[in-house]
Amino acid sequence: MVIFYYFNSLGQEIITLPYDNTGLDYQGPEVEKKGYLTDKNNFQNISIPTIQVFLPRGNLNTKTAMIVCPGGGMRANAIHHEGFDVAKALNKKGISAFVLKYRLVPIHLIGKNEGLDHPYSKEKKQLAYGHLDALNAIAHVRENALKYEINPDKIGIMGFSAGGAVTMEATYKSSEKNRPNFLAPIYPWMKIVDDQEPPAYGPPIFIVCTTEDTFKLAIPSARIYTDWAEKNYISELHLYHHGKHGFGMRKTNYPVDNWFDNMVDWIDAIGMLN
């Protein structure tokens, strides 16, 4: 499938990734709606996956790259505080960022009971498409490493909430051409991810969550850490008490505000930054 490129009003490159919507019933275009705990709009009804490119300026470039997967329950994409704001912060650390708009549950199906057994059946089904978008994003960045001036062996993926589920599922299902070299699930929503073994190549993992998380994601986050640690894979878990779900890059005035700098220090410590 042909990959399309275009630029937004700020001159940032936006790439349309390969996709096949067989089995999905989209009606109408993408929709912008007021987001969860934010005054900025989130996107819904995303049927065409894209990545938006954020590159560090000049000599800042460390040749490290990160795919960023915003959250939103597979029904929305919180692209500002869990996407663009993250990308800009990564750029300041010399890391190239690629913000992913993965495919979401069709908007006309949100809130409808389809008589399926799993309480999150629509979201779980959508993960099968969303994780493919993440894998295609990694593959695209790796194939274009020279263009983006990055090291093809220093490509990470991070995601928030449902984006954390996309991050984990993509890692579990990855192959040599599209596997991440490291990953950072941030309060990952593991209820829609089946239990799986860490991949044999053992990518380093950095996990963040809080015990105050509205959706009780601390224990599943700890389980991910245990899975990695039991195999002696590089793994780090930052589990804070204070901090509600969905903080992203917003300040909470609690210790969890240090998560981003801690993550960058960890990326450096595992040899993926310099």
Roles of regions detected by a PLM:
Residues 231-274:
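C-terminal catalytic histidine-bearing segment of alpha/beta-hydrolase fold enzymes
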Residues 57, 71-72, 161, 211-213:
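Residue-level signal for short, function-critical loop segments
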Residues 12-26:
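Short N-terminal segments immediately surrounding and downstream of signal-peptide cleavage
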Residues 1-14:
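Bacterial Sec-dependent N-terminal signal peptides
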Residues 129-201:
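Primarily recognizes the serine-hydrolase "nucleophile elbow" in alpha/beta-hydrolase
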Residues 65-69, 97-101, 154-158, 182-186, ...:
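Structural recognition of the beta-strand scaffold that forms the well-ordered cores
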Residues 25-31, 36-42, 47-52, 57, ...:
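Serine-hydrolase catalytic machinery in alpha/beta-hydrolase-like enzymes
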Residues 181-239:
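The feature captures the conserved acid-bearing segment of alpha/beta-hydrolase catalytic domains
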